[in-house]
């Protein structure tokens, strides 16, 4: 009885881990930020900068949430044996 409940919990938790991994690993996403500055002579200057998120930061974002959920799923599957 408990093994069946734990195996179902492992499947559900692994599905949550996959969803968390998809939402927290934005590979190749770019963020654009524009800023407007007003100089002393009255001219307006608009600057823009583009920051590309590296894969290392995405791996860090992945391991923060989804890795813990995946380990809970592994623990549930091992305990269901």
UniProtKB/Swiss-Prot annotation:
Membrane topology, record value: Single-pass membrane protein
Ranges where the record places region Disordered: 27-53
Annotated keywords: Membrane, Mitochondrion, Transit peptide, Transmembrane, Transmembrane helix
Transit peptide start and end: 1-20
GO CC terms in record: external side of plasma membrane; mitochondrial membrane; mitochondrion
Segments passing through the bilayer: 59-79
Domain of life: Eukaryota
Places the protein is found: Mitochondrion membrane
Biased composition (Low complexity): 28-53
Protein name from the UniProt record: Uncharacterized protein C27E2.11c, mitochondrial
Native source species: Schizosaccharomyces pombe (strain 972 / ATCC 24843) (Fission yeast)
